[in-house]
Amino acid sequence: YDLGIEDTIEKIIKTWKSDLYVNDKKNLGIIFNGIKGTGKTIASKILCNRLHLPVIIINQESANLIDFIQSLEFECIVLIDEAEKTFKNEQEELLKMIDGVYNASRKLYILTTNELRLDDNLLGRPGRIRYIKEFGNLTINAINDYIQDNLIDKNKRSQILEVVDSLEISTIDILKAIVDEVNVH
C-alpha cells in the first residue's frame, strides 16, 4: 500500500550505497516513528527486502547484545522494534551499538518507535541517526488500495470512506477493523 514512504526509502538506500558510507564502512541509523498501525513495520520490511541484507531483529534487552552485534563480521540490518521500550534503561548501550566503533563491518540500524522520546545524545549526532521518518494517518491511496483488496461488498466502499474520514487518526489497524466489521455484517 502507498504509505508515502518511497522518497524516504530511496534516500536511505542511496545513502547506504554511497561511496562515503561504503568506503568509510559507516553505520547508518534511521528512526521510523509513529503510533501503532501507521506503517513503520511495513516500511522496515520494504527497506530490508530492497537491500537484500540479513536482518537481526531485536525486541528486548540482553546482557551480551553489544558483543553479539559487534561479532557479526558481515553487513546486515539491525531492526530494533519499539526502541524506546527495548532500550528504556540502556540507551547508552544503544548509542555504543550505533556508533559501531568496534564493528567488523557496517550495519544499518532501523529503530521503530511509538513515542519519539529518545536520549538527546542519540538524536543530536548526525553520525548516529541520519534520518527520522514520522508516520501519521494513512494516505488516501493506501486507504483505497486496502478497501479494494479486502472489502467483500464493494457497494459499501463509500460507507467505509465516510467513517474513515470522520476519524481523527487513521491507521492500518483501525481500517482493518472497520473493513472486517462491514464484511461480517
Spans of model-derived segments:
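Pre-Walker A (pre-P-loop) alpha-helix and adjacent loop at the N terminus of AAA/AAA+ ATPase modules
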Residues: 1-28
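Short glycine-rich substrate-engagement loop in P-loop NTPases that contacts/grips substrate
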Residues: 6-10, 43-76, 87-92
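Walker A/P-loop nucleotide-binding motif
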Residues: 21-44
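Short loop/turn elements that form and flank the Walker-type P-loop nucleotide-binding site
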Residues: 25-26, 72-74, 103-106
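Hydrophobic positions in the central parallel beta-sheet of the AAA+
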Residues: 30, 78-81
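Conserved nucleotide-binding/hydrolysis micro-motifs of P-loop NTPases
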Residues: 62-63, 84-85, 114-119, 137-143
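Conserved catalytic/switch belt of AAA+ P-loop NTPases
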Residues: 84-131
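C-terminal alpha-helical "lid" subdomain
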Residues: 124-185
